[in-house]
Amino acid sequence: RLIEAGTRCVTLAFSRWDHHGDNFNALRQDAPLLDQGLTALIQDLHERGLEKDISVVVWGEFGRTPQINKGAGRDHWPQVSCALLAGGGMRHGQVIGATDRLGGEAKERPVKFGEVFATLYKALGIDPDFTTLADLSGRPQYLVDEHLPPMKELL
């Protein structure tokens, strides 16, 4: 309803997802809620014909350790992360990249943050190679560091 009313960006957050301890009990509570909410959102977008116009992004700033710590949790792990992207006219129903068997290191098609950003900007009709925003000093800053290309697998 917010999007249909003209809102350009909607951000939702629930729970902490920072389970350094009691990981399994926390996920038993939170994961079904995320699953049900995302399913309802994506179904609703399809029913309203908005699935090509709206990008859904579920993403954290880092992954979690492949090993459980002493407090039955997982700590920060920047080597590997995951994201869920849907809608926005992107190709769906695929997994891009792979890790080793423990989920500790990227082994196939590592994806950089900038590639995901470039993909989202491209889906929004924004060219990240030429679009800049002024920083607090008035200097132009590109939207994506390193001028990384959008992910060809998604577009």
Segments and roles (model prediction):
Residues 1-155:
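Ligand-binding pockets and gating/stacking loops
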